[in-house]
């Protein structure tokens, strides 16, 4: 997908919450925008549709969690299933990104900004990091 101005929504998938970020390939930047509730990994698909339409997204990016040794876990399979359902429901290209350590990095950045109050949920910040990783890969293509 090089040489295109793409608007992407990035997702940090979880069984209870799904973080969402938006970014684009013009500046290769991303912003955390939402945390969606999920029930056993099933989101409110209408809210996702609304986000896609609001931001005019033309590509979706899903973080895929692996164990530190690269092995897969139960959540790995659930995140892939979520990515497939996104593609089937909305007909947009879906990219998957290795999301190891994004939550730890999100916490580090939170405190680095001088924010001392412990964040309740960092899912949308993790989605931002996932999307920034994908945007950097697009820049390097």
Curated annotation (Swiss-Prot):
GO terms for cellular component: cytoplasm. It is found in: Cytoplasm. The keyword Hydrolase applies. InterPro entries: RNaseH-like_sf, YqgF, YqgF/RNaseH-like_dom, YqgF/RNaseH-like_dom_sf. SMART domains: YqgFc. GO terms for molecular function: nuclease activity. GO terms for biological process: rRNA 5'-end processing. Keywords: Cytoplasm, Hydrolase, Nuclease, Ribosome biogenesis. Its EC number is 3.1.-.-. Signal peptide: none annotated. It comes from the Bacteria. Could be a nuclease involved in processing of the 5'-end of pre-16S rRNA. PANTHER family: POLYNUCLEOTIDYL TRANSFERASE, RIBONUCLEASE H-LIKE SUPERFAMILY PROTEIN. Belongs to the YqgF nuclease family. This is Putative pre-16S rRNA nuclease. It comes from Coxiella burnetii (strain RSA 493 / Nine Mile phase I).
């Amino acid at each position: 997908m090089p040489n295109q101005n793409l608007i992407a929504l990035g997702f940090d998938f979880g069984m209870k919450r799904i973080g969402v970020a938006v970014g684009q390939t013009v500046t290769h930047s991303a912003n955390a925008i939402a945390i969606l509730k999920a029930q056993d990994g099933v989101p409110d698909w209408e809210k996702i549709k609304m986000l896609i339409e609001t931001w005019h997204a033309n590509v979706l990016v899903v973080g895929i969690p692996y164990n530190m040794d690269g092995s897969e876990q139960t959540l790995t399979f659930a995140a892939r299933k979520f990515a497939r359902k996104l593609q089937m429901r909305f007909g947009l290209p879906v990219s998957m990104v290795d999301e190891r350590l994004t939550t730890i990095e999100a916490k580090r950045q939170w405190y680095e900004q001088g924010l001392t109050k412990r964040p309740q949920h960092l899912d949308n910040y993790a989605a931002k990091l996932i999307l920034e990783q994908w945007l950097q890969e697009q820049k390097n293509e």
